[in-house]
């Protein structure tokens, strides 16, 4: 009997595949695209840099001049008490957010908006960046990290620089437990070894010259713990006919 695909099992919404979103620090997005940004710029100070269990990149807590606090993706080389700017007249410095039409060609950018004002949708993983290739009247061409050329609305915002946390994948997990916790934080299931791939001493379905259970996979509900694998107390198996 076949197995359900992971995407099918995730769709049921069981606790195994449910993301622990109650641990997340909050929504990481740009502030609203208001008159302050459309006609000038707004300055903010980085008051903290925190870790969000739900993402790979560090998150900066920014307090703006108008008293507003926002969580934004931290760029490389940023530090607490640094200033960042948001708006059409902001300078071209790492961490500053501007409309694509105001950013020079060849500049590395990240957290690009798909539509103006949506808060940022593309290039948000640690260590990633996209390159602004060329400007046109009604679109801006950007080379994504995958190498794909994608057209964006010139009024969509992006942040200058590279997302912090680069080189994350170069550090090995070393232990299966570390891998387990990294997957669990994002609502993913740790991989397990199949019983038919084991030796006979390790699993009731193990052993043999090829990978097959070698015996019926139905088992009594009253079987001992080490034997209770497969279809437990199944009334029937196989397809309905």
Swiss-Prot record:
Q: Name one GO biological process term.
A: cytoplasmic translation
Question: Keyword tRNA-binding on this protein?
Answer: no
Question: What terms describe the molecular function in GO for this protein?
Answer: rRNA binding; structural constituent of ribosome
According to the UniProt record, one GO cellular component term is: cytosolic large ribosomal subunit
* InterPro entries reported for this sequence: NA-bd_OB-fold, Rib_uL2_dom2, Ribosomal_uL2, Ribosomal_uL2_arc_euk, Ribosomal_uL2_C, Ribosomal_uL2_dom3, Ribosomal_uL2_RNA-bd_dom, Translation_prot_SH3-like_sf
Pfam families cross-referenced by the UniProt entry = Ribosomal_L2 (PF00181), Ribosomal_L2_C (PF03947)
Q: Could you tell me which residues belong to the region Disordered?
A: 200-241
Q: Which UniProt keywords apply?
A: Ribonucleoprotein, Ribosomal protein, RNA-binding, rRNA-binding
Q: Which parts form a coiled-coil structure per UniProt? A: none
Cited function: One of the primary rRNA binding proteins. Required for association of the 30S and 50S subunits to form the 70S ribosome, for tRNA binding and peptide bond formation. It has been suggested to have peptidyltransferase activity; this is somewhat controversial. Makes several contacts with the 16S rRNA in the 70S ribosome.
HAMAP family under this entry?
Answer: Ribosomal_uL2_A
Extract the NCBIfam families matched here. Answer: PRK09612.1
**Per the similarity annotation, which family is this?**
Belongs to the universal ribosomal protein uL2 family.
Oligomeric state and interaction partners are given as: Part of the 50S ribosomal subunit. Forms a bridge to the 30S subunit in the 70S ribosome.
Protein name stated in the entry: Large ribosomal subunit protein uL2
């Amino acid at each position: 009997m076949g197995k359900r695909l992971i995407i099918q099992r995730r769709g049921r919404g069981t606790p195994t595949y449910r993301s622990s979103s109650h641990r997340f620090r909050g929504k990481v997005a740009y502030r609203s695209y208001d008159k302050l940004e459309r006609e000038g710029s707004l300055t903010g100070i980085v008051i903290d840099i925190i870790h969000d269990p739900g993402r790979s990149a560090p998150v900066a807590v920014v307090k703006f001049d108008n008293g507003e606090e926002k969580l934004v993706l931290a760029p490389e080389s940023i530090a607490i008490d640094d200033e960042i700017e948001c708006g059409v007249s902001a300078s071209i410095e790492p961490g500053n957010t501007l409309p694509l039409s105001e950013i020079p060609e060849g500049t590395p950018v990240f957290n690009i908006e798909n539509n103006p004002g949506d808060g940022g949708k593309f290039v948000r993983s640690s260590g990633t960046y996209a390159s602004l290739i060329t400007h046109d009247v009604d679109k801006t061409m950007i080379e994504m990290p995958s190498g794909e050329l994608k057209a964006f609305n010139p009024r969509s915002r992006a942040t200058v620089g590279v997302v912090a946390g680069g080189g994350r994948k170069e550090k090995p997990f070393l232990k299966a437990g570390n891998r387990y916790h990294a997957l669990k934080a994002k609502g993913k299931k740790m991989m397990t070894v199949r019983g038919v791939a084991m030796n006979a001493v390790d699993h009731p379905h193990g052993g043999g010259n090829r990978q097959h259970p070698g015996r019926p996979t139905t088992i009594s509900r009253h079987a001992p713990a080490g034997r209770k694998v497969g279809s437990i107390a199944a009334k029937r198996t196989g397809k309905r006919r």
